[in-house]
Design a protein with these regions (language model features):
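N-terminal acidic, proline/glycine-rich, low-complexity intrinsically disordered segments
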Residues: 1-8
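Acidic/His- and Gly-rich active-site-bordering loop/insert found
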Residues: 9-124
Length: 128
């Protein structure tokens, strides 16, 4: 991935700049997972490896994981922090039969993971 001047320029909003910086710290692993999910498509309700990749990353980052929620073995809930502010992110990782990730769910998974990791870091610093 190539970094542009716009991507490295200081953001005028300090809070957004902190979150962007927190994301950049996790960007290599987030992109690696998005690419791995793309290279290993699993259709709905069979995406065990994709779920494991995503859940394991969040668990390593300090999230508490509940796997197999809502009677779906490939679903999970990851939580971190406490208090009245709640952010919910949907991590989609299923592929289309015969098309793979033409739907872009691998990218949605990566975006959601990146957002979760960046926001969690800000939560630990009590800046969100």
């Amino acid at each position: 991935m190539t970094t542009t001047a716009a991507a490295t320029a200081a953001h005028p909003d300090p809070a957004k700049a902190q979150i962007a910086g927190a994301y950049r710290a996790h960007e290599p692993e987030v992109l690696a997972i998005a690419r791995a999910i793309h290279a290993d498509p699993e259709i709905a309700f069979t995406e065990h490896r994709a779920q494991e990749r995503c859940a394991d990353l969040l668990e390593r980052a300090g999230f508490t994981l509940e796997r197999g929620i809502a009677d779906l073995p490939t679903a999970f809930r990851a939580t971190i922090g406490e208090g009245s502010l709640v952010a919910s992110l949907c991590v989609e990782y299923d592929a289309l039969p015969e098309l793979g990730h033409g739907c872009g769910h691998n990218l949605i998974a990566g975006a959601s993971l990146g957002a979760a990791l960046a926001l969690a870091e800000q939560d630990r610093k009590s800046t969100v």
